[in-house]
Amino acid sequence: MLALAGCSGQNAEYHPVTKGVTVKAPPPHEHEHGPHSGHLVELGEEEHHAEVVFDAKSAKLTIYILDSTAKKAEPIDAKDVALKLTIDGKSEGFKLSPVPDTGDPKGKSSRFELAGDPDIKAHIKDEEDLKGTVNVTIGNKNFSGDIKHEH
């Protein structure tokens, strides 16, 4: 509420402010998560998404390929998904192998995994430590998306 006061002489009148301005607080910041509770990475201009999931106990990285809505699996025929991560200030490359998910058609996979890599075990403790780029070929087109955590 806003109120103003001042002196204007003998015949001053006081008028209370009856209308206030309501200001809404912004909604709390929410991270975008995919159907497997992982971090979403945009591929192309919302054409596809990659969902990056990290299991801290096993140090296993899983990338799910999702459709434009980031809700449904999108099985692809890629041999792998390339991941470049920044570890100790250096860019390191990793390949995640296809592990077809339930319902993926023969010869295609919507899930790609990397388990037991010593560099990941030593340096990545949770999802927030993942900084880098996902690279994948879907159909005949190459896609790249940044893993970034906005706070």
Where are these regions (language model features)?
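Intrinsically disordered, low-complexity terminal tails/loops enriched in metal-binding residues
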Residues: 5-151
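Sec-dependent N-terminal signal peptides
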Residues: 1-3
